[in-house]
Each structure stands twice: as C-alpha cells, then as structure tokens.
Amino acid sequence: MLGLQIFTLLSIPTLLYTYEIEPLERTSTPPEKELGYWCTYANHCRFCWDCQDGICRNKAFKNHSPILENNYIANCSIYRRNDFCIYYITSIKPHKTYRTECPQHINHERHEADIRKWQKLLTYGFYLAGCILAVNYIRKRSLQTVMYLLVFLVISFLLSQLMLYGELEDKKHKIGSIPPKRELEHWCTHGKYCNFCWDCQNGICKNKAFKNHPPIGENDFIRYDCWTTHLPNKCSYEKIYKHFNTHIMECSQPTHFKWYDNLMKKQDIM
C-alpha cells in the first residue's frame, strides 16, 4: 500500500507535464498569431497575402517584397490535430495535401522553466517519500520492507530526473551563420533571401541549394545576414536587418517545396 502511494506521488508531476496543443478545425483563415508558422511552409496560400490592384503584400512577413498577383497564390485550407498540421491547396482538383509537424514549444525558455519546475516537484516528492519511509521504519521496525521500498523509490526518482534532464540537454542550441552544406536545401527553402543561399559574382547570383534555380541579379533581397538555430525537433533562423526577425520551422519538414517554380513562370522573384 505504501509503495502504491509513493508511486502515485512520483507520477503526478510527470502526468501534469504532458499536454496537447489545441486542435484547429478546417478553415481557410488561420489565427493571426499563427500566420508566421503557416506562411513559412505554405507561402503560396492566399491567406498569407493581401492583394490590392494586382499587387500582393505578405501578411506574415511585413518586409517581404511585394509581388504581382498571379496563379502562384492559391486558395488553401488548414487543419490541425494534436500531433500534426495539414494544409490543402483547394484551387487544384484533386486537392493537394501537405502534412507538417506542429510546433510544440515555440517558446523554449518557457519550456525549460516548466521542466525545472517539475524537477523541483520530484525532488520535494522524494524528500517527502523518504520521510514516510523513515516513519514507517520507526513504527514497524521492518528494515527489509523499507529497503525494498527505498530502492524502488530511488530508481523511480533517477529515471524521472534522467528523462527531464535529457529533455533539457537536447534543447541546447546549435547556432551558426553558415549551415552545413548538407542542410542548405532545408534552410534555403525557408530562408531563401539569406546570403548563404547565393553565390554572387559580377552582379549575377546563383542558388547554392537548387542548381536548376534561374540565376538572378544581385540585389538587396538576398543580402540578409542570417543566423541559424538547429534543435532536435525544431529549426529557426534570424534575419539580421536593422533588428532581429526570427522564423521558426520544423527540422523534419520536407524541403522539396520548389517554391520558386510557379513563381518564376509569372514574374521575377523580386
């Protein structure tokens, strides 16, 4: 009976720690606070653009260059469940569907603070359970029973601590201004204006990640210095231009969106 009480005491913080993100029913208008996420992946969806008089401006990224309204901008719907997000291109028959992984922890500092809070709770629970064992030993003098329970308690406590410390260890940032060559396709799908994606000579720039990308003229659009951050399940890049502008995406997200193909059919990417 005492062992069951101790196990329950140790399990409560772990159960409280787990949570699910809020579902989102199918809609063509994502919440404004989520536009940055959706428009990082589905940057051709109409909900990302404000089009007036044939000129379209990006709603999520205000410093994105205006583009001409064209067939590249498609009607889309989005849908979210606990462990995945989906967007549909409804302008095409049959509908094209893309599955992404939803951001679980946008604010990493808050996530780490939560983990440390549960570590403290587990520590206090360990002390409390130790007091219960001591009282039980004094009352019943059953040393063998107390030793079994103590071993069980220590093992449970260590496993819980290892799980949480491992979570923190995995969150260490890997930061650099130039991503590894093998990751260029991922970073240049999302951070296409970062200067590490382009090789510029004599005013002509070629894309390093996508060899079949048409050459473009050197201009301010591709002169941004970017810092990349690579976590186990999330990547972000910061565009350094007057002030830091951070964009977050999932590292495991497929990179073969070929965002430029349809756009280049209608206009220069400028």
Swiss-Prot record:
Residues 139-145 are cytoplasmic. Glycans are attached at residue 75. Pfam families: v110 (PF01639). It is a multi-pass membrane protein. InterPro entries: ASFV_fam_110. Keywords: Early protein, Glycoprotein, Membrane, Repeat, Signal, Transmembrane, Transmembrane helix. GO terms for cellular component: membrane. Residues 27-117, 167-270 are extracellular. A repeats lie at residues 27-146. Its main location: membrane. B repeats lie at residues 147-270. It is found in: Membrane. The keyword Transmembrane helix applies. Disulfide bonds: none annotated. The keyword Glycoprotein applies. The chain crosses the membrane at residues 118-138, 146-166. Induction: Expressed in the immediate early phase of the viral replicative cycle. Plays a role in virus cell tropism, and may be required for efficient virus replication in macrophages. Belongs to the asfivirus MGF 110 family. This is Protein MGF 110-1L.
